[in-house]
């Protein structure tokens, strides 16, 4: 029979009832719909571990970065400080799974066995039994990743090199995510905590490896990660920071929180790949060039894109998808061909035009309906320069990418032209329309 580590802080650090917990996680993760869509996702995260009412929003900001990781990340290596039981080294549990109100997460026993020859890795179920630093991360991970296996290590006294050695052995590829759980300074007055934490945030971003436990309670695992980041020249990006005085606590004695992400591959690099896919698809048909294969797990997930062709800076074709219904690489290739050869506004692209053409690929977030009471309310909610809009009414639909704001910066004029594009009368009541918005990540290439 499988042995399970039961949830120890459900109902205290986070809701113990599954539906309430799922709703709270969804609220945190959906708190910032202004974030652009993501192609890349982090190799590692640094997240806080207080009760959700205190640090949940800061933790969620890190987990939002995993939007593109679902179905790719299959293993999470989770390290945090051992608060309850003294540990020499890094303590692995002997159980088969960790349980939360959202279900159980199986441990990667093979990965844990791969550490058996390292003297700094020990077995200790007591170190995990009541430990909250790892447990509070699991509901977020279960929500954003779905199925994954877990390598949990409660870290006690250990050197930087000892922690880094464990992380390097477990590093893996895109299937492996590293998560370090740590808070910042503890129990200073608000202003003093902000001063201390500001210095600590700068040191983390600079990949310092000599943080102490007055700066971060999880300094030991964090120093190990930062040593790996320094060795691999991976930048450390600050996502969010605050303290308990900013959330649910008083200001006399506060605890600091932060979240960071470490990316091995940037969105810019992923964008270069999408541009290359679009160009290769067009050149295969236009110039008879050999087909090019692009293999990467993230290209296999569903994605929605628009491909735009510009000739000497003027529109030459633009076709896209508003919903993610096919693999990302296929979506880009098909939309590139449609923009070049099937946009009804333009003749088919000719080979002689190709040298004057620039290719843009826009990667879309999932459209979200805007709930509004009247035109004034709608205008207040629209983010000029950022939102792409979809307008639907009377069986007609049209969209403008955010790029259109460059030529039509006025919100009323933008909506008026969108009505015209949909074939609707200029005096159509906006209250009778369904309007959704999305964000894009736009990439340019010759």
Residue ranges and their predicted role:
Residues 2-248, 261, 271, 289:
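Active-site histidine-anchored catalytic micro-motif
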Residues 17, 41-45, 75, 256, ...:
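A generic secondary-structure signal marking the coil-to-beta-strand transition
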Residues 191-194, 251, 366-370:
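Short glycine/threonine-rich loop-to-helix capping motif typified by GTGT followed
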Residues 266-446:
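Basic nucleic-acid-binding interfaces
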């Amino acid at each position: 029979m499988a042995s399970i580590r039961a949830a120890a802080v459900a109902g205290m650090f986070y809701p113990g009832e599954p539906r309430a917990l799922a709703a709270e996680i969804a609220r945190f993760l959906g708190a910032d719909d202004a974030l652009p869509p993501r192609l890349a996702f982090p190799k590692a995260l640094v997240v806080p571990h207080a009760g959700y009412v205190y640090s949940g929003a800061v933790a969620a900001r890190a987990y939002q970065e995993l939007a593109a990781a679902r179905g790719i990340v299959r293993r999470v290596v989770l390290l945090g400080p051992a608060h309850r039981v003294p540990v020499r080294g890094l303590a692995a549990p002997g159980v088969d799974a960790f349980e939360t109100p959202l279900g159980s997460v199986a441990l990667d026993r093979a990965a844990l066995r791969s550490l058996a020859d390292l003297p700094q890795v020990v077995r200790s179920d007591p170190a995990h039994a009541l430990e909250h630093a790892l447990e509070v991360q699991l509901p977020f991970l279960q929500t954003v990743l779905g199925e994954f296996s877990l390598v949990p290590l409660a870290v006690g006294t250990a050197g930087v090199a000892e922690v880094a050695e464990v992380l390097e052995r477990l590093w893996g590829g895109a299937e492996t995510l590293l998560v370090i759980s740590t808070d910042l300074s503890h129990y200073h007055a608000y202003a003093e905590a902000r001063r201390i934490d500001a210095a600590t945030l700068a040191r983390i971003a600079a990949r310092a490896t000599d943080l102490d436990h007055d700066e971060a309670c999880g300094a030991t695992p964090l120093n190990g990660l930062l040593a790996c980041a320094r060795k691999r020249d991976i930048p450390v990006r600050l996502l969010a920071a605050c303290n308990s005085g900013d959330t649910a606590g008083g200001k006399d004695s506060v605890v600091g929180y932060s979240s960071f992400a470490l990316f091995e591959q940037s969105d810019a690099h992923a964008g270069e790949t999408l541009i290359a896919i679009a160009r290769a698809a067009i050149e295969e048909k236009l110039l008879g060039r050999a087909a090019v294969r692009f293999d990467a797990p993230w290209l296999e997930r569903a994605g929605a894109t628009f491909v735009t062709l510009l000739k000497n800076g003027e529109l030459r074709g633009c076709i896209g998808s508003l919903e993610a219904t096919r693999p990302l690489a296929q979506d880009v290739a098909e939309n590139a061909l449609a923009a070049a050869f099937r946009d009804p506004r333009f003749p088919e692209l000719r080979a002689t035009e190709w040298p004057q053409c620039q290719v843009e690929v826009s990667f879309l977030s999932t459209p979200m309906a805007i709930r509004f009471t009247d035109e004034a309310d709608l205008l207040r909610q629209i983010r000029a320069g950022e939102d792409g809009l979809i307008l639907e009414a009377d069986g007609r639909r049209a969209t403008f990418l955010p790029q259109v704001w460059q030529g039509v910066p006025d919100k009323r004029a933008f909506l008026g032209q969108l009505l015209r594009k949909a074939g609707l009368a200029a005096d159509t009541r906006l209250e009778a329309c369904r309007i959704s918005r999305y964000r894009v990540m736009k990439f340019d290439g010759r």
